[in-house]
């Protein structure tokens, strides 16, 4: 077998002059070769083990001119050209049955006088394939994100399996090409068999992504009605805590009673719905968080009755205020206000079809079916008409539904799905100020910790990584980092 790092002697760049645990200083005698070098060029250094090559990144180039850099421990009076190389890994000609394997670790460090060669041209192309574990001749199964800046003929690949098996992060300042990178990845993912991905498009900037394998969905706006491509997320999909974060004013002195009565009414009306559907056998197993439809109008009527209730006194014919009389007034007002808010049409629409027992199935089919049987694998969800004050709640609602369905599914029936979280700092914040933000964080932190067990991968996308939750970032293994200022 011929390795990719077989060089002729006239290709020699230099030899190792000094070495420590992570860097090596290379002596370069040929001035022409020194002039052809650039910072960030890749080099290979001869290893003491047969079939292994140490890979390094050029971090500094110094010409013989008496330049002094005591901080770098270089000889004050240089009589030869040197380059400083940061060691980044080891290339193996063969490992088991695999050929051209790159490992991000050092089995050895260079020895003095070890030969150093530049990685360029065809060797750079082959090495980039090795880095992303692309089998030669099978480039179409991997994801291309661009070309190596120092040699534009060398393609930069990402191994799709490795990218999505672990949570990923794509960061870069505005204008650095972050959105282009995301779009490029999605265009290639969409072409793959059985692809399944969701993109949370917060500002509608990915509407131009078109093709037979893309589905564009939009969270309903104020004037939207039930139709293909329009998403309605009815209130009964919210968990108890999510509903309280939206409706309850925790500074109210009556907040504990309001929360208790709300929970009682939710359970009651969910059971009433099941009873009306002839599904009494399910009543014993439902919880506050079970996605069972119920009528908000009927629940408000019941709460209003409790708020105005008068009960008999001990003296015949006399009445007094009931135990909850006047305590639910502000809570009911908040419910009514949300109910009438046109901006929340996607949640509080009075469309009767949103109270169907099988609406959850229809929603999950829109969100989660992979690219099979004519279905489109990449779903782009436009949140541009969702009010910013409840955006974290609505985005996390969809993420939670996806995670919960994956969790409930039998192992053999699960299909892996990737969730691309664009503008993640808006709904996965490092610091929270509102209970709505807390509810969102609970969902995404759980997915970051447990999602891989159930086939749910996160791709966190942000131009402000310092404002993204640290727990979510710490659970990510793959990083694509562009120019950053935040």
Predicted regions and their residues:
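Loop/turn-to-beta-strand initiation segments
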Residues: 194-198, 375-378, 414-418, 454-459
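P-loop NTPase motor domains
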Residues: 207-208, 214-217, 235-443
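Conserved AAA+ ATPase "SRH/arginine-finger" region at the nucleotide-binding site
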Residues: 218-221, 232-237, 476-486
């Amino acid at each position: 077998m011929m390795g990719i790092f077989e060089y002729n002697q006239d290709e020699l760049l230099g030899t190792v002059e000094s070495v420590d645990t992570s860097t090596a200083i290379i002596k370069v005698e040929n001035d022409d070769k020194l002039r052809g070098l650039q910072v960030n060029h890749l080099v290979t250094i001869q290893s003491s083990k047969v079939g292994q090559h140490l890979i390094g990144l050029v971090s500094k180039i110094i010409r013989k001119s008496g330049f002094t850099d005591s901080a770098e421990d270089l000889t004050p009076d240089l009589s030869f050209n040197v380059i400083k190389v940061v060691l980044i890994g080891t290339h193996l000609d063969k490992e088991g049955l695999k050929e051209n394997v790159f490992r991000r670790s050092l089995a050895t460090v260079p020895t003095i006088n070890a030969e150093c060669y530049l990685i360029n041209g065809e060797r750079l192309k082959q090495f980039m394939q090795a880095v992303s574990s692309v089998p030669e001749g099978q480039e179409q199964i991997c994801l291309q994100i661009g070309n190596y800046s120092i040699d534009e003929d060398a393609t930069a690949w990402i191994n799709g399996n490795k990218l999505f098996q672990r949570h990923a992060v794509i960061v870069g300042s505005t204008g650095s090409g972050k959105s282009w990178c995301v779009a490029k990845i999605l265009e290639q993912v969409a072409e793959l068999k059985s692809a399944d991905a969701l993109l949370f498009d917060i500002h509608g900037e990915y509407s131009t992504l078109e093709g037979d394998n893309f589905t564009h969905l939009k969270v309903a706006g104020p004037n939207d009605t039930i139709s293909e491509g329009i998403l309605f997320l009815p209130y009964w999909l919210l968990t108890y805590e999510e509903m309280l974060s939206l409706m309850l004013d925790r500074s109210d002195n009556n907040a504990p009673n309001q929360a208790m009565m709300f929970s009682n009414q939710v359970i009651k009306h969910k059971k009433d719905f099941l009873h009306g559907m002839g599904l009494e056998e399910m009543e014993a197993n439902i919880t506050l968080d079970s996605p069972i439809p119920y009528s908000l109008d009927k629940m408000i009527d019941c709460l209003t009755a409790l708020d105005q209730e008068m009960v008999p006194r001990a003296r015949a014919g006399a009445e007094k205020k009931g135990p909850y009389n006047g305590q639910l007034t502000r809570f009911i007002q908040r419910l009514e206000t949300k109910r009438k808010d046109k901006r929340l049409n996607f949640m509080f629409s009075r469309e009767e079809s949103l109270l169907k027992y099988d609406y959850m199935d229809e929603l999950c089919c829109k969100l989660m079916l992979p690219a099979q049987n004519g279905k489109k694998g990449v779903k782009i969800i436009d949140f541009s008409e969702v009010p910013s004050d409840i955006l974290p709640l609505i985005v996390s609602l969809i993420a939670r539904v996806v995670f919960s369905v994956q969790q409930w599914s039998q192992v053999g029936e699960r299909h892996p799905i990737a969730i691309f979280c664009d503008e993640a700092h808006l709904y996965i914040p490092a610091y929270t100020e509102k209970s709505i933000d807390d509810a969102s964080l609970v969902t995404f932190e759980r997915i970051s910790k447990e999602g891989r067990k159930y086939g749910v991968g996160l791709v966190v996308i942000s131009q402000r990584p310092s404002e993204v939750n640290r727990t979510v970032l710490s659970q990510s293994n793959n990083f694509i980092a562009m120019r950053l200022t935040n």
